[in-house]
């Protein structure tokens, strides 16, 4: 009975952490079924995302520090979108006033929503990292993974080499989390795989509702190739590494009270 209670509590905390992504998916579905007046669909999606972000901060569901991380992800995601659309990896075929070089600005919020989930789940589940690697190993690895999304169009795709490096670097790393007062743990690599798989499922839902289209989905929707899991897995790793590194820096930085005490 306790196991069921723990699973339900864990699911509830995860659902609360997924609030921003859930609103985006609901907006994609509603605007696909019910056309909204006055503005193109992409522009309404941008307005909804901005209002949702403001509400999340004003309501206290997200802190200002988390907003900084989420904004960073928005910019990182938007840069990736601009490049990938230019290279023909996917497209946004609908009209919109808020499109830049074929990319609607709301697309950055889809990446930001992943950061929102990570930040909130981290706080709600009181996540801690055990045997976290050196900053000097984590940052170059995250940078290499992100850059490979660009460079593989012009040279060798090294995603599988990078995946192997991730396993080596984080072989001894565990993530611990709290559910209803009890602490649990799992290998960090397993958490990467699980999050990447669920984002692939979310990607299928998003493309079904016309968030964007891959070349094989222009005429009719089809399941996103399972190989995309590897791409999302690596993107999740980049996201997690950035959030974790910023959390580590935040925890190691002295608070104002500590600084005042040290000078007293």
Curated annotation (Swiss-Prot):
Instruction: Give the transmembrane region(s).
Output: 19-39, 42-62, 69-89, 100-120, 136-156, 160-180, 192-212, 223-243
Record's subcellular location: Cell membrane
- One GO cellular component, as annotated: plasma membrane
Q: Which InterPro entries match?
A: DUF817 (IPR008535)
Origin organism is Bacillus subtilis (strain 168)
Q: Which UniProt keywords apply?
A: Cell membrane, Membrane, Transmembrane, Transmembrane helix
This protein is called: Uncharacterized protein YoaT
- In this record, what's one Pfam family? DUF817
Q: What is its main location?
A: membrane
The keyword Membrane belongs to this UniProt entry's keyword annotation: yes
Q: Report membrane topology.
A: Multi-pass membrane protein
């Amino acid at each position: 009975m306790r196991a069921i209670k723990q699973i339900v509590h864990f699911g509830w905390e995860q659902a609360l952490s997924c609030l921003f992504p859930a609103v985006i998916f609901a907006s994609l579905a509603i605007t696909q079924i019910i056309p909204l007046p006055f503005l193109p669909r992409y522009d309404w999606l941008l307005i909804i995302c901005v209002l949702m972000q403001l509400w999340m901060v004003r309501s206290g569901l997200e802190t200002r520090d988390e907003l900084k991380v989420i904004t960073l992800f928005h910019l990182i995601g938007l840069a990736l979108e601009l490049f990938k659309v230019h290279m023909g990896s996917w497209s946004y075929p609908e009209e919109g006033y808020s499109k830049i070089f074929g990319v609607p600005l709301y697309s950055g919020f889809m990446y930001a929503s992943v950061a929102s989930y990570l930040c909130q789940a981290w706080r709600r589940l009181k996540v801690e990292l055990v045997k976290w690697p050196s900053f000097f190993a984590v940052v170059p690895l995250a940078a290499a993974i992100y850059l490979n999304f660009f460079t593989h169009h012009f040279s060798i795709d090294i995603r599988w080499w990078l995946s192997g490096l991730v396993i080596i670097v984080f072989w001894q790393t565990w993530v611990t989390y709290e559910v209803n007062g009890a602490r649990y743990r799992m290998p960090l690599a397993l958490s990467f795989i699980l999050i990447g798989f669920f984002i692939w499922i979310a990607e299928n839902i998003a493309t079904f509702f016309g968030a964007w289209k891959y070349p094989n989905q222009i005429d009719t929707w089809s399941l996103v190739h399972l190989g995309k899991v590897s791409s999302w897995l690596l993107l999740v790793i980049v996201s997690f590494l950035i959030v974790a590194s910023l959390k580590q820096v935040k925890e190691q930085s002295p608070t104002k009270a500590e600084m005042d005490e040290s000078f007293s």
